[in-house]
Amino acid sequence: MALIVQKFGGTSVGSIERIEQVADKVRKFREAGDDLVVVLSAMSGETNRLIDLAKQINDQPDPRELDVIVSTGEQVTIALLAMALIKRGVPAVSYTGNQVRILTDNSHNKARILQIDDHKIRSDLKAGRVVVVAGFQGVDENGNITTLGRGGSDTTGVALAAALKADECQIYTDVDGVYTTDPRVVPQAQRLEKITFEEMLEMASLGSKVLQIRSVEFAGKYNVPLRVLHSFKEGPGTLITIDEEESMEQPIISGIAFNRDEAKLTIRGVPDTPGVAFKILGPISAANIEVDMIVQNVAHDNTTDFTFTVHRNEYEKALSVLENTAKEIGAREVIGDTKIAKVSIVGVGMRSHAGVASRMFESLAKESINIQMISTSEIKVSVVIEEKYLELAVRALHTAFELDAPRKGE
Amino acid sequence: MALIVQKFGGTSVGSIERIEQVADKVRKFREAGDDLVVVLSAMSGETNRLIDLAKQINDQPDPRELDVIVSTGEQVTIALLAMALIKRGVPAVSYTGNQVRILTDNSHNKARILQIDDHKIRSDLKAGRVVVVAGFQGVDENGNITTLGRGGSDTTGVALAAALKADECQIYTDVDGVYTTDPRVVPQAQRLEKITFEEMLEMASLGSKVLQIRSVEFAGKYNVPLRVLHSFKEGPGTLITIDEEESMEQPIISGIAFNRDEAKLTIRGVPDTPGVAFKILGPISAANIEVDMIVQNVAHDNTTDFTFTVHRNEYEKALSVLENTAKEIGAREVIGDTKIAKVSIVGVGMRSHAGVASRMFESLAKESINIQMISTSEIKVSVVIEEKYLELAVRALHTAFELDAPRKGE
C-alpha cells in the first residue's frame, strides 16, 4: 500500500464533468488500496476571472487582499471533488491551505512554503479518507492567506509529498509524459520513461513547459519521485527521479528543448574595463527585465561586444535602456534581433562524453544553419540561431543524437 | 467617536460599481471619525451560482463541503471592498469568518455563532484600519468552515456589534427603512423613525422581509441598536431598539404586515379526545412541513374542527399527509384553500389599549370582508381572509389605525 500525492491542474478540473472524471480516477486508485492526497488547482479560467475582478477595482490591487480573492478558486474545486468522492462512497475531506496548515512566508502573491503540518492529513488517511488539498495557497504565521504565485499547485503537491514522505507525487497534465522534443516539430519524438531532476530542470526552463520549474527543484531537493501523467488517458507517463544508474546504455542526451520567445540585444564597441558587465546589466535588472543567455567574448582593440537575450515582450523596453547605457559608457552601437530561436540539447550523459557540443555544431553546419550565440552548462549546450531554421535544427539534432528510434530499455 | 458596524447585502455589493459606491460611503463615515467594522454578503447571485455548482455534483451535497464552497462568495467581496478602500487612502483589512475568528457550532449550512474573538479587530481599529468581515460564515472548534444559512450576514453584523459593544449596527438594504405597511399596497405608508425589537420581529415574521428575523432576535437579546438604511440614498432610516418611552403619544399600532404565501387546511369532524392535536400535527411535522397559524375551536357533538396554515408550496404535500391522518383518526373530511391571505396589525401600544382587535374586525366588516381565522399574541392580531380582499383590507386598516397621516413626533 503506497501513499501517493496526486495533483490535477486547472484543465483537469475545468468543468463538473471533468471533476467527476477525476473522482472516478481517484476512486480507482483508492480501491487498489493506495492512500491518497489529492491537490487541485482552480477551474481553468477562474483564477484569471478573479484577478480581473480585483483589477477592476485597482490595477495594482493590494497584494494581501488579492490573495484573499484568488485563493477562493481552489477552495471551490476541492469541495466539489470531495463531494464527488463522497457521492461515490469514497470517504473524503477537503482542506484549504490554511486548514492543513501550509505555513508560508508573508510574500503575498509569491509566497514560499516554510512548513506543512501533516497532523490532520495523517489522521484522515488513517481513518481511510481521501484528503483533498487546495494547491497554490497557504497561510502566514499571522493567519493571513497567501498564494504561491501562478502554477504553484505543482509546488504544493511536491511539498506535501515531501512532508508526508509519499512514495510518489503524480502530476496529471494534458500530455502523457515528457518527450525527447516537441512532437509537433518532430513526429518521431519519443516519450521518456525516466528523466533526472537536473535534465527536467533544463528542459523546463528551456521551454518544455510540462512542469513548473520550482516544483522540480523542490522535488529534487527532497528527492520526491515525480511522475508526469495524462489526466484522462491511461499510461505510465514519465518518472522524474534521481540519476540512479549511470550505465553504458544511458543515452548521451535525453532531449532537445527550444524556445522562440526570446530576443537578442548586442552592445558593440564597449570599452573593455572592469565593471562594464555590471554597468550594462545593472540598469536592465533595475528595469525588472529578466535576462536569459549572456555572452561576452574576449576583447580586441580594447573594446568588446556584449550580447544577451530577453523575453521578446521586453525587447523594446530593454533596447531603450541599453541605448541609454551605450551613451553613458561610450559604446559604439546597440543592435538587436527578435527573429531568433534558442535550441538546446540536454542530458546528464554528456558529462561523460566528450565531443557532444562538436557533434551538435557539426549537424547544424551540415544543414547550413549559422550559430549566433553559444552557451553551455554541465548538462546542456544551447545555441541561438535564426528563427526560421528552428524546426530544421531540432529535427537534425533529434536524428543526430539517435532520439528518433525507440530507445534501449524502453 | 462612535464604533459602528455596517452591514451591506448582496445587492449593495452586486457589482464592481456598487462596491466602489460602498467604499465611498464607508470613507465618508471614516472621515467623520467613526471606527468602522463592515460586514458583507456575497455578490447577489453568487451564492446561488455556487450552490448550483455543488448540486451539479450531488443534489444533496455533503454539508461540510458545501460550506467550503459557499463561503468563497463573501471572501471575494470583502477583499474587493478592502482593495477599494485602500485605493481611496483608507487603511483597511479583510477577514474571513475563520480569520476573525467567529466560532460556531458544527451544524453545517445553518450554524449558530458561539463566540467571537474581538482581539484582531480591536487592534486593527486601534491602528486606524477599517475592518471588513465576511458575513454569513464562521468556523467550528475543529477548524471546519461553517455557514449560518441564507441571509445570515445580518446575524454576523449584530453578533459583531454585540461582541464589540458597538454603538449601532447599521443594516444597509434596498429600502430606506421600515414602513407602516408595504408602500406598493398603501401609497400613504409612512417610514417609521423607531420600532421596537418585538414589533420588528412580528413585522418580519409576517412578511415585511426587511431584516432577517434571527438577527432581530439577536439584537434584542444583546440590546444592540439596529438601524435599517438604504445603501445608496441618504436618510436616517429606521432605528430598531428597546421600548424606552411608553408614552401617551405612542401610536397604538406600528404597522400592518401581510402575507400571501400561505394555504389553509382544515380537518373536520375530528373526535374530540385528548392528544388529537398531536395526532394531526405530528405527521405534518414529521414530513418537515412548517405550520404557521393553528386554530381549534371548542367542540360540539363530541367532534371538533382543526385548521392550520402552511406555506403554499407545501400545500399538496400537507394535504396528502392530512388525508391519511383523517382516515386513521376517523375524521369526517379534509378541506383546504390556497387562495387566502394573512393580515396582521402589530404594535406594542396595543398592550395598554383595549378594543384594538374589535376595531380591526369592525373596519374589515365595514368593507364586507369575511374573517376566516383569527389568532392573537400580545402585540399582534392576525386574521386570514380571502386573498382577493388583501389590498382592500390593508388599506382600510392603515386608515382605521391612523397610519396614513404623518405621525406625531416625526
Where are these regions (language model features)?
Chain A
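Nucleotide/pyrophosphate-binding catalytic subdomain
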Residues: 1-216, 297, 309, 384-386, ...
